[in-house]
């Protein structure tokens, strides 16, 4: 009886893992449809941003499934949902990322500070420059709690559940109105995911 239950559980785990792998593969394929557009726009601009990073950010933001694929409306207009076409979204996203990367170079901080600043805003780069010059989860969480959330109305440190493979090891929560302090780590993870799946697809 117990052996049968164990077999069923193992089978269920394998089926779930297979389904998730399939979904991730489909998401990667969707994101990769923007590769030519990203490549073209990067070639038009003097930028330290690279194709792999931009694609990983698209994966993180929307998995390529919305008009504003890089969720760049707010950086362009100060309001959300003002961009609804992919080209404008990617162009604005690259412009914002480029500004962050150049500011990060100027301040002597790491590239992942610039990536996290895509979610928090460029003032985060100054914060990291004054606190060790390297983006860490602890500093991102502190900035979310003490700067971003209060600025947007959450002065009590109120949190909400946030389930993600990275967050589950760090409390599985975010601050209300505090942005996403896991953002740069998610982009890094998604960069590796895209590399792995595209390598697998190429070799296959």
Swiss-Prot record:
GO biological process: carbohydrate catabolic process
One of the record's GO cellular component terms: cell surface
Compartment(s): Cell surface
InterPro entries: CwlT-like_lysozyme (IPR047194), Lysozyme-like_dom_sf (IPR023346)
Any one Pfam family match given in the protein's UniProt record, by short name: Lysozyme_like
Superkingdom: Bacteria
PANTHER family recorded: LYSOZYME, PNEUMOCOCCAL VACCINE ANTIGEN A
Name of this protein: Pneumococcal vaccine antigen A
Organism: Streptococcus pneumoniae (strain ATCC BAA-255 / R6)
């Amino acid at each position: 009886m117990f052996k049968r239950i164990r077999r069923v559980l193992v089978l269920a785990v394998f089926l779930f893992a297979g389904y998730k792998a399939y979904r991730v593969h489909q998401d990667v394929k969707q994101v990769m449809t923007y590769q030519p557009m990203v490549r073209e726009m990067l070639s038009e601009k003097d930028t330290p941003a690279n194709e792999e990073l931009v694609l990983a950010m698209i994966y993180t933001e929307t998995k390529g499934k919305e008009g504003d694929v890089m969720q760049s409306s707010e950086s362009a207009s100060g309001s959300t949902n003002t961009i609804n076409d992919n080209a404008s979204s990617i162009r604005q996203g690259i412009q914002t990322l480029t500004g962050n990367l150049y500011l990060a170079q100027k301040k002597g901080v790491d590239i992942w500070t610039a990536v996290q600043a895509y979610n928090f805003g460029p003032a985060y780069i100054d914060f990291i420059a004054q606190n060790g010059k390297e983006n860490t989860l602890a500093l991102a969480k502190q900035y979310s709690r003490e700067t971003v959330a209060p600025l947007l109305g959450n002065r009590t440190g109120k949190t909400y559940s946030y389930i993600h493979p990275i967050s589950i090891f760090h409390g599985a929560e975010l601050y209300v109105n505090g942005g996403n302090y896991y953002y740069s780590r998610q982009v890094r993870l998604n960069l590796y995911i895209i590399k792995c799946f595209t390598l697998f697809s190429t070799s296959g």
